[in-house]
Amino acid sequence: MTIIIIVLSYFLGSIPTGFLFGKFLKNIDLRLIGSGSTGATNVLRNVGKWPAFFVFIIDVGKGLLAVKLSQSYTNQHLFEVLAGISAVSGHIWPIWLKGKGGKAVATGLGMFIALSWKVGFASLGIFLIILSKSKIVSLSSILAAFFLPLFMFLDIGVTNHPYFLISLVVSILVILKHRTNIRRLIKGEESKINSLNK
């Protein structure tokens, strides 16, 4: 049963929310425009504010539901982590889109809200604070990911717990998925979210 839940979590994460919104609302393939990501930020820029909001909420739900599904079966922390990272992996490398998905920010957030709501909302707080000051989504995501392992350590107090280890893995993964954004940030060329009037 554990293997089934882990596999189901991957397929849950693989649901291409942003891609579907782009196709149905604007008949566009988000993989071919903007950042090429199917995440909420690319939806915001190319489809609209409200579609991006719903994509974000659904993508958060994918990570949260995967962990909650595992918790309904067992309370083993390692199993919860495996289900969560399976959903995150599905979001980044969805089978339906030949492995080209999002950057794991929203789905990772949902995963950590389910594992530790304090850590999840602390990371969300960092994201929102940086976004309000900088108007740069990528910078906000990178810094939220950077502080994630610290928040988890402060919450559980150890570094050999599956929760801390997965926070480290997801932090690195999210930052690596933003490599091109980091290069643009260094050059001062990263786009800002200045208008949300779509």
UniProtKB/Swiss-Prot annotation:
Pathway: Lipid metabolism; phospholipid metabolism. GO terms for biological process: phospholipid biosynthetic process. Its EC number is 2.3.1.275. InterPro entries: G3P_acylTferase_PlsY. The chain crosses the membrane at residues 1-21, 77-97, 111-131, 136-156, 157-177. It holds the Pfam family G3P_acyltransf. GO terms for molecular function: acyl-phosphate glycerol-3-phosphate acyltransferase activity. It catalyses: an acyl phosphate + sn-glycerol 3-phosphate = a 1-acyl-sn-glycero-3-phosphate + phosphate. It comes from the Bacteria. It is a multi-pass membrane protein. Keywords: Cell inner membrane, Cell membrane, Lipid biosynthesis, Lipid metabolism, Membrane, Phospholipid biosynthesis, Phospholipid metabolism, Transferase, Transmembrane, Transmembrane helix. It is found in: Cell inner membrane. One of its GO terms (cellular component) is plasma membrane. Belongs to the PlsY family. NCBIfam families: glycerol-3-phosphate 1-O-acyltransferase PlsY. Probably interacts with PlsX. HAMAP family: PlsY. Catalyzes the transfer of an acyl group from acyl-phosphate (acyl-PO(4)) to glycerol-3-phosphate (G3P) to form lysophosphatidic acid (LPA). This enzyme utilizes acyl-phosphate as fatty acyl donor, but not acyl-CoA or acyl-ACP. This is Glycerol-3-phosphate acyltransferase. It comes from Prochlorococcus marinus (strain MIT 9515).
